[in-house]
């Protein structure tokens, strides 16, 4: 990543003592480290502790190790169902997301200890009015998804079927799916808008961002085929010119937007493995990831994004019973089905695969900026250094 401090310069040799004077006594600590030692230290450490690139690499390795260990334990405890990838029940979703969340939290906590940060809240969770932003995010997520469903129904691209649940089951499955999607929100936002967005912001520039995104696109070209990959390519290309202009103009806060370009593209990338995803759905995942980055910038934390993400998924999967990234849940309240042209209905991808989702995401972004954009949250730039203890 971009150097955070300049490499140390060789120190001048001390003057010889005058005749008749005793040479000053020096302790071992008075002697400077050999250049080789200081050079190695500079490679790994910057003014804010562990450099961003090494921090991200450590985080990725730890999260993979923790997820593997937890997955093995949960499987042995028979908490993950039959192991069928298409099994989409509230209990399986809850425990699967619990693995991801615990692995992410454990990895972030260990990296935080290495970086001497005071708590996990240092990663874009410290901002003002946290609970207000969280609950307003819940409202925004449900309202945005409802607007999308309403638009699809109005256009004749979605039909409502019978209500699938009744009595106590409505509350039972509603609560179970709410718990599962809260974990989804905490895991995915915790990974992308909290840890990665925070860490990349303190150590990235345009060329590093371009290199990361180029590597992601090369990986797709070499290993993954299908329609969905074009969503990643499209979003990566969309961010290229704005980020380059920010770079050449040396705009304040440029690193935040370079990081947002990277984390949002990666967010689209991880959704390619979902069942039934088309390129619109992948592009929409990256686009909503960018909206969540904007929410971090204008509210001062990721709490709005966590709430919005959880409520969007809950409304889509449980309340309306639509496919979520190609998966239809067991135990949903309403029943809906796509009708007509896949570009408008979303087909097997669900509402997120419809062109209408891009309009809804755009409106959500406009509303977010209109409501919060003129307010001044706690500075994210100062938050980069504040949590580090000496």
Predicted features and spans:
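Membrane-interface helix/loop boundary segments of multi-pass membrane proteins
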Residues: 187-215, 221-226, 236-262, 294-301
């Amino acid at each position: 990543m971009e150097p955070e401090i300049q490499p140390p310069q060789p120190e001048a040799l001390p003057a010889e003592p005058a005749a008749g004077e005793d040479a000053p006594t020096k302790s071992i600590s008075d002697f400077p480290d050999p250049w080789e030692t200081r050079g190695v230290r500079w490679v790994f450490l910057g003014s804010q502790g562990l450099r961003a690139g090494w921090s991200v690499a450590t985080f990725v390795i730890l999260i993979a190790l923790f997820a593997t260990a937890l997955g093995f334990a949960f499987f042995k405890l028979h908490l993950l169902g039959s192991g069928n990838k298409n099994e989409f029940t509230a209990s399986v979703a809850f425990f699967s997301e619990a693995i991801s969340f615990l692995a992410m939290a454990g990895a972030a906590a260990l990296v935080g200890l290495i970086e001497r940060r005071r708590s996990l809240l240092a990663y874009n969770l410290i901002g003002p009015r946290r609970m207000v932003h969280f609950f307003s995010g819940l409202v925004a997520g449900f309202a945005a998804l409802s607007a999308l469903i309403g638009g699809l129904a109005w256009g004749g691209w979605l039909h409502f079927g019978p209500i699938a649940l009744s009595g106590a089951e409505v509350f039972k499955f509603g609560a179970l799916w709410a718990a599962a999607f809260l974990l989804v929100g905490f895991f995915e936002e915790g990974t992308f808008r909290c840890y990665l967005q925070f860490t990349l912001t303190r150590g990235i520039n345009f060329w590093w961002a371009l290199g990361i995104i180029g590597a992601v696109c090369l990986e797709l070209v070499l290993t993954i085929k299908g329609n969905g990959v074009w969503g990643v390519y499209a979003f990566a290309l969309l961010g290229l010119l704005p980020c380059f202009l920010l770079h050449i103009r040396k705009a304040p806060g440029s690193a935040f937007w370079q990081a947002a370009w990277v984390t949002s593209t990666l967010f689209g990338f991880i959704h390619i493995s979902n069942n039934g995803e088309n390129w619109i759905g992948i592009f929409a995942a990256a686009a909503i990831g960018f909206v969540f980055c904007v929410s971090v910038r204008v509210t001062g934390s990721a709490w709005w994004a966590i709430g919005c993400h959880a409520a969007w998924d809950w409304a889509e999967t449980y309340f309306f019973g639509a496919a979520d990234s190609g998966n239809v849940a067991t135990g949903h309240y309403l029943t809906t089905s796509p009708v007509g042209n896949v570009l408008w209905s979303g087909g097997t991808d669900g509402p997120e695969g419809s062109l209408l989702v891009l309009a809804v995401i755009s409106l959500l972004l406009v509303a977010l900026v209109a409501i919060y954009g003129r307010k001044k949250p706690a500075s994210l730039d100062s938050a980069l250094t504040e949590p580090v203890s000496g």
